[in-house]
Amino acid sequence: MTAFADLHHADAPLLLPNAWDHASALALAARGFPAVGTTSLGVAASAGLPDGAAATRDDTLRLALALGSQPFLLSVDAEGGFSDDPDEVAEFARQLWVAGAVGINLEDGLGPPGRHAAKIAAVKSAAPGLFVNARTDTYWLGGGDGDGDGYGDETETLRRLELYQQAGADGVFVPGLTEPRSIDALVKHLTTPLNVLYSPAGPAVPHLADLGVRRISLGSLLYRRALGAAVETMTAVAAGRTPQGTTPSYEEVQALSRPVLSHRAHG
């Protein structure tokens, strides 16, 4: 078992912050988080591209290359692998592994579960040490906690997750799942660690831990809050008010580039 996989079996769930660039990743790691993920929305929006449209393959790989040698465990949000061809997804995953990533997040987008399972199997064959977090979008795109059409309910969710487990997934991810009873039911049926997306309106971290959740991702929340803080700061200044909140100093932000400069100097 890898160090990253071990974090999914510790006493407390893995709380995974999601970064969108070098500075955000290094700042989070500096606060003691042993692993940092990326957010596909943050990466896409920063590049002026849409999320979930397979448009950010190069941007995602570029960020992985910048972060893979840093002193934290890196997991990459790769949307659906940027292709419907399992071999192409596997090759991209192999490149992430070579770059230094230890995990990959692959979402099914409510597409054919057999196709997604084939992607997972191909990735595990190409990069056996890469932790594959298989995401199903039954709750994210399927209408929330049950909408009567087979999506957003436990039966369809479990059907997909069991198929992904059989294909070799190391963990499974159900964003949008917040109802404690449904979380508890899934945990009892799964053989791999369950990952959920943190929601300010959902259960708190201690409650999720009690339910058996093993990984809690922040997704795009940090990126969206950073955008909100920037706008609020400018609005306050324009209104003659002193901006509130914590602001890193110029020197603190500048210091975040030193690991990269040091790596390049000795590379």
What do these predicted regions represent?
Residues 221-267:
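Extended, intrinsically disordered, low-complexity segments
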Residues 16, 20, 102-110, 153-154, ...:
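Catalytic beta/alpha-barrel core
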Residues 50-76, 99, 112-135, 178-203:
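Alpha-helix-loop-beta-strand connector modules within alpha/beta enzyme cores
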Residues 1-18, 22-30, 121, 125, ...:
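N-terminal amphipathic alpha-helix/helix-capping segment at the start of soluble metabolic enzymes
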Residues 24-30, 82-95, 200-213:
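Catalytic cores of alpha/beta
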Residues 7-24, 49-57, 74-88, 131-156, ...:
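Active-site mouth loops of central-metabolism enzymes
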Residues 35-61, 80-84, 104-118, 123, ...:
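Glycine-rich, proline-tolerant flexible connector loops at the mouths of alpha/beta enzymes
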Residues 98-167, 239-258:
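Conserved anion-binding
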